[in-house]
Amino acid sequence: MAKAVTIKIKLVSTADTGFYYVAKKNSRTMTDKMTKKKYDPVARKHVEFKEAKIK
């Protein structure tokens, strides 16, 4: 069987609230770390989320 192209990653809030989203990423086309600006309900505002490994 072939290796899966998409992998699951954790997007952790840079506001240090501990909140995170789980997202999928194509490991072949997106080789660099993913960053997205999304809503953090703990901080109650839009902040940048950075990629981290799911343990």
Curated annotation (Swiss-Prot):
A molecular function GO annotation: structural constituent of ribosome
One GO location term (cellular component): cytosolic large ribosomal subunit
Keyword Ribosomal protein listed: yes
InterPro entries assigned: Ribosomal_bL33, Ribosomal_bL33_sf, Ribosomal_zn-bd
Protein's GO biological process: translation
UniProt entry keywords in alphabetical sequence: Ribonucleoprotein, Ribosomal protein
Transmembrane segments: none
PANTHER family per the UniProt record, alphabetical: 54S RIBOSOMAL PROTEIN L39, MITOCHONDRIAL, LARGE RIBOSOMAL SUBUNIT PROTEIN BL33M
HAMAP family: Ribosomal_bL33
Family: Belongs to the bacterial ribosomal protein bL33 family.
Protein name according to UniProt: Large ribosomal subunit protein bL33
Organism expressing this protein natively: Rhodopseudomonas palustris (strain HaA2)
Biological classification of the source: Bacteria, Pseudomonadati, Pseudomonadota, Alphaproteobacteria, Hyphomicrobiales
Name of the encoding gene: rpmG
